[in-house]
Regions:
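Pyridoxal 5′-phosphate
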Residues: 1-376
Length: 376
């Protein structure tokens, strides 16, 4: 099997898997308990909190563990119902864990403006500024898009937010471990993360909350996570999240170089095989190792079926159901026409991929394109 869908999820790092097993075996106490078993588990959690904080450039007391990026986003957004200013500026390419939440919040008096993107999937800070109203209390723009990888100008947007006295949230789920992140330098007030995107476990993530800010809990009960997120902590998962973040950031330069070399090799060879292909996303301000490519005349659902038969996992932003295929929402917002849109695939390389994997991938692409052509 050949896995090229690391933007969807990543395999557990072996060291993370080992640590989680050890924590489950030897640190199983309830972290809220005062006895030694509980206190040992609490130390594990606080160690992970420190690792996570160091990875994203903040203080330990600014990191709050959640069940993942979706919960972290929800925690920030649902707090709007407690705020006086209930208008949000966001973008049309945000994850459903932002846009669908905002849709649901409308019945609670929250409104939002979703600014568009350019042909490369980039948000224009000037459009963000123009969308601000007297009632705007939050700006929520992702750090990097999950489908085509474009990195957004968060620092510039942060300057606008600060000038206007507006809080800034950024969904950074796709970015950690791929590009350097420093919450202080970026100037954000809230930032969401998910461990399974950086070789950590599923079902655990984190939210950065700038010191001095307070959020009302979504999940109410005990006093865990300093009363921001009730419920007995997932100690093995949190330990895995912390170590995965540490490992990802410590090797970020090597990872960046490796992923870029794989993407470069793939682009060069696939362009030679099929000269009329189109690469989507920003040519430079892009996550390393993520390639969104359109194959005009070849539907993405057919491409994925043929590639899957060869043991290759890639993905598509297009929704396939009962033989019908709907264009990718993200690519449509970039004004890519439907004919090209439904022929687009996302290839996202990971640290375990090799140049030999790229050779196999491009060889299978070549045979797949030939097979589809001959059967047309």
């Amino acid at each position: 099997m050949h896995y090229f869908d690391h933007s969807a999820t990543t395999p557990l790092h072996p060291k993370v898997k080992k640590l989680m097993g050890e924590v489950g075996d030897f640190h199983f106490g309830n972290p809220s308990s005062v006895h030694a078993f509980g206190q040992k588990a609490k130390i594990v959690i606080e160690t992970a909190r420190g690792q996570m904080a160091k990875a994203v450039g903040c203080n330990s007391n600014e990191i709050f563990f959640t069940s993942g990026g979706t919960e972290a986003n929800n925690l920030v957004l649902w707090n709007l119902i407690h705020q006086n200013k209930k208008h949000v500026v966001t973008s049309v390419i945000e994850h459903p864990a932002v846009l669908k939440v905002l849709d649901n919040l409308e019945e609670f008096g929250v409104s939002y403006t979703a600014v568009g993107v350019d042909k490369n999937g980039g948000v224009n800070p000037n459009e963000v500024q123009n969308a601000i109203t007297a009632d705007t209390g939050l700006i929520s723009i992702m750090l990097a898009n999950n489908e085509m990888g474009t990195i957004q100008p968060i620092r510039e947007i942060s300057s606008i937010a600060k000038e206007q006295g507006i809080f800034l949230h950024s969904d950074a789920v796709q970015a950690l471990g791929k590009i350097p992140i420093n919450a202080k330098d970026l100037g954000v007030d809230y930032m969401s993360f998910s461990a399974h995107k950086f070789y950590g476990p599923k079902g655990v993530g984190a939210l950065y909350i700038r010191k001095g800010l307070k959020l009302q809990p979504l999940i109410i009960g005990g006093s865990q996570e300093r009363r921001v997120r009730a419920g007995t902590e997932n100690t093995p998962g949190i330990a895995g999240c912390g170590l995965a973040a540490e490992l990802a950031v410590n090797s970020i330069q090597d990872t960046h170089t490796h992923l870029e070399s794989l993407a470069k090799a793939f682009k060069e060879e696939i362009k030679r095989i099929s000269p009329d292909i189109i690469f989507n996303g920003h040519p430079k301000k892009n996550l390393p190792g993520l390639v969104n490519v359109s194959f005009p005349g070849y539907r993405s659902d057919l491409l994925m079926i043929y590639l899957d038969r060869e043991g290759i996992a890639v993905s598509s932003g297009s929704a396939c159901s009962s033989g019908d295929i709907k264009p990718s929402r993200i690519l449509s917002e970039m004004e890519i026409n439907d004919e090209i849109n439904i022929c687009s695939l996302r290839i996202s390389f990971g640290t375990g991929n090799t140049l030999e994997d790229v050779d196999y991938l491009t060889t299978c692409f070549k045979s797949t394109l030939e097979r589809i052509r001959s059967s047309a």
